[in-house]
Amino acid sequence: MYLSRNLEQWHAFVEMLRTAFAQGKEQEILTLLLTPDERDSVGLRLQIVAQLLDKSVPQREIQQNLNTSAATITRGSNMIKTMPPEFMAWVKEQLDEQAKKD
């Protein structure tokens, strides 16, 4: 699984997120660290992952629904393939729970 070119920086980032989330400062830390465009990209990636895990919609249709490129959908699909199946099952469960709340 590819994490980062610089694992030390990645681990520092993850640790900062853990600390911020544990202290209820998730909005502030993500706003500080991510530009509006990056936040939009993360939100789009989450939508892509959700639709890919649903498996009822073809990738081309996901691309059209989300008004994004085929390459963006492919990158999401390829990353899913690198993750442990147990983790992806957990992600799907979380997404399904979130969908019930909405």
From Swiss-Prot:
DNA-binding feature ranges: 59-82
Localisation: Cytoplasm
Keywords in alphabetical order: Cytoplasm, DNA-binding, Repressor, Transcription, Transcription regulation
Recorded superkingdom: Bacteria
A Pfam family that the UniProt record links to this protein: Trp_repressor
Molecular function per GO: DNA-binding transcription factor activity; sequence-specific DNA binding
Matches recorded under Gene3D superfamilies: TrpR-like (1.10.1270.10)
Gene Ontology BP annotations: negative regulation of DNA-templated transcription
Entry-linked SUPFAM superfamilies: TrpR-like
Cellular-component GO terms for this entry: cytoplasm
Main location: cytoplasm
UniProt record similarity statement: Belongs to the TrpR family.
Job of this protein: This protein is an aporepressor. When complexed with L-tryptophan it binds the operator region of the trp operon and prevents the initiation of transcription.
Subunit field text: Homodimer.
Name of the protein in its database record: Trp operon repressor homolog
Organism: Pasteurella multocida (strain Pm70)
